[in-house]
Curated annotation (Swiss-Prot):
Coiled coil: none
Family: Belongs to the TolB family.
Chief place of localization: periplasm
Function (record text): Part of the Tol-Pal system, which plays a role in outer membrane invagination during cell division and is important for maintaining outer membrane integrity.
Protein's organism: Pseudomonas aeruginosa (strain ATCC 15692 / DSM 22644 / CIP 104116 / JCM 14847 / LMG 12228 / 1C / PRS 101 / PAO1)
GO biological process terms, semicolon-separated: cell division; protein import
GO CC aspect terms: periplasmic space
Subunit and interaction comment: The Tol-Pal system is composed of five core proteins: the inner membrane proteins TolA, TolQ and TolR, the periplasmic protein TolB and the outer membrane protein Pal. They form a network linking the inner and outer membranes and the peptidoglycan layer.
Record protein name field: Tol-Pal system protein TolB
Subcellular location: Periplasm
Keyword Acetylation attached: no
Domain of life: Bacteria
């Protein structure tokens, strides 16, 4: 019983401030201010009003990165829709560095979107393109244009066309709560329900190709790990061991799954070959070992352990079993996520002498740590695959919500989501 209580207390502590999913991370503030840009309302050569405002979506994408500050429409002296209509003195007068124009033309039952991006200072066109899709794909086309523009101006691949997983919990009565696993655009738009249950769903994770997701479901009245195919909805139960089955994490090649089991007593980290279902135990310690996250080489595993008395982050060589402690700043560091360049570690952090749980990033070369969030009781950070943005769960007005933060700290906004408590965000990899 004492072991179960210890597990429960540690789990509650992690829920009060855990870190979830990540990828590449840029810890660079760059200029003192975001780059001013104007995304002019796109012209539309059609009779009906479009259901989505493309220029608004593109502007929000660029703003969310923390690199750009879109000019409010009311401050625009002119609103050209064609490249030939751009008057550079208008944009120099309002102080923007770049201006984007676009035009939407119906073509054979579809929409063709032509766009152009200009450097105001040099008065040169830096990007032009065309994309075609249906009315239902207006958001997809908007995210695509934002991706192309962001990469052209920064040299960093855009991540606005990615997706996000999250869990909602809507309580109707004391013993009646509905849990749903949702997949949406990265900004919370267009949510689609992948799974609905009367029992909790936790720890959703994308596979490296984004086609599968792993998660923990309590539908059998005990935690079990499932893998579900995003497109078809087909599910496979992966674990059915006694005790805790939790914290799944796909290996970089997608062929193995690390997770936590308490089948031998206390929680330990195991890895399963998904082809053969062969199981191997990785950790062997009297403490709680949990929340595995793979290094990109597939032979390094970061994890949380209280083997030093309080939750801290360690790394293990999967082949040799050698373990080293990674975090030393603060009295609580948990749920590690590694940047793609393996120079930065993202985690849930609590400073010595404080009670707040916040999201932080540690430079693994210099050792310094920086707090990224300005809220409390923060949980489950997940980083965009290009490292420019971070989404995490927190609580506002006694409700679970998701927050988007640019890594450079310039942008902090709540994301629109469904009713009820929203939790457990997980950012997708780049998708085809």
């Amino acid at each position: 019983m004492s072991t179960l209580i210890r597990i429960a207390l540690f789990a509650l502590a992690l829920m009060a401030g855990a870190a979830q999913a990540a990828d590449p991370l840029v810890i660079s503030s760059g200029n003192d201010r975001a780059i001013p840009i104007a995304v002019v309302p796109f012209g539309f050569q059609g009779g009906n009003v479009l259901p989505e405002d493309m220029s608004n979506i593109i502007g929000n994408d660029l703003r969310n990165s923390g690199y750009f500050e879109p000019l409010p429409r009311q401050n625009m002296i002119s609103q050209p829709a064609q490249a030939s209509e751009v008057i550079f003195r208008d944009w120099k007068a309002v102080g923007v560095n770049y201006v984007m124009v676009g035009n939407i033309v119906p073509a054979g039952g579809r929409l063709q979107v032509q766009y152009a991006l200009f450097d105001v200072g040099t008065e040169q066109q830096v990007l032009t393109g065309s994309v075609t899709g249906s009315t239902d794909q207006l958001r997809d086309m908007s995210h695509y244009i934002a991706d192309q523009s962001f990469e052209k101006l920064t040299g960093i691949k855009g991540a606005f066309s990615t997706k996000m997983l999250y869990v909602t919990a809507e309580r109707f009565s004391v013993d009646n709560t509905r849990y749903t696993l949702q997949r949406s655009d990265y900004d919370g738009a267009r949510p689609v329900t992948l799974l609905q249950s009367r029992e909790p769903i936790v720890s959703p994770r994308f596979s490296p190709d984004g086609r599968r997701i792993a998660y923990v479901s309590f539908e059998q009245k005990r935690p079990r790990i499932f893998i579900q195919y995003v497109d078809t909805g087909r599910r496979e139960q992966i674990t059915n061991f006694e005790g805790l089955n939790g914290a799944p994490a796909f290996s970089p090649d997608g062929n193995r799954l690390a997770f936590v089991l308490s089948r031998d007593g206390n929680p330990e980290i195991y890895v399963m070959d998904l082809g053969s279902r062969a199981l191997r135990r990785l950790t062997n310690n009297l403490a709680i070992d949990t929340e595995p996250f793979w290094g990109k080489d597939g032979s390094t595993l970061y994890f949380t352990s209280d083997r030093g008395g309080k939750p801290q982050i360690y790394k293990m060589n999967v082949n040799s079993g050698a373990v080293d402690r990674v975090t030393f700043i603060g009295n609580y560091n948990a749920n590690p996520k590694l940047s793609a360049d393996e120079k930065t570690l993202v985690m849930v952090h609590r400073q010595q002498g404080y009670t707040n749980f916040q999201i932080a990033a540690q430079d693994l070369q210099r050792g310094n740590l920086r707090v990224l969030s300005n809220t409390t009781l923060d949980d489950s950070p997940t980083v965009a695959p290009n490292g420019t943005m971070l989404i995490y769960a927190t609580r506002q007005q006694d409700r679970g919500v998701l927050m988007l933060v640019s890594i450079n700290g310039r942008v902090r906004i709540p994301l629109p989501t469904a009713q009820g408590d929203v939790r457990e965000p997980s950012w997708s990899p780049y998708l085809n």
